Amino acid sequence: MTTLRFRLLGEPHIEADQRPLTGFISTKAQALLIYLVMSPGRHSRNRLANLLWSEFTDDQARNNLRTALSNLRGLVGPHLDIERDAVAYKRDMPFWLDVNVVRDTFGSRLDKQVISRIDEATALYQGDLLDGFQVRNAPIYEDWIL
């Protein structure tokens, strides 16, 4: 069973069994997969078509969605539940999503202020706490550092 890995914090990178997933027919096809994995639940085809192809007529948008779904079916078919009126990402299939790791760590509220604070903390990190700093004959202090 193929495991998909989604690294979306920063430049998007998607892997299937530890290899880059390639073969997307368009950026919008890739965006559709990203939207589905980040947005649990069933999504109507009309909503998805409007999400990505709102500048087209309804018929053109639905046709573009069909084409993108056909492409995704070939790339990650078992991970998608594609029905006549709705599409969903199957949560019971193996996948890893970096955004979920952050949400689980910091809570589901990732507003701009929280993200800014995470960026600040990341910029401050220069290495392990007191890396290379040693105090001789103070084993309790050294244990505390660890």
Stretches found by the model and what they are:
Residues 2, 22-23, 27-29, 34-38, ...:
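Intrinsically disordered, charged and Pro/Gly-enriched terminal/linker segments
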Residues 14, 29-33, 48-49, 65-76, ...:
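DNA major-groove recognition helices of helix-turn-helix
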Residues 35-48:
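Short capping segments at the starts of secondary-structure elements
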Residues 39-41, 76-79:
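Short glycine/proline-enriched coil/turn segments at helix->beta-strand junctions
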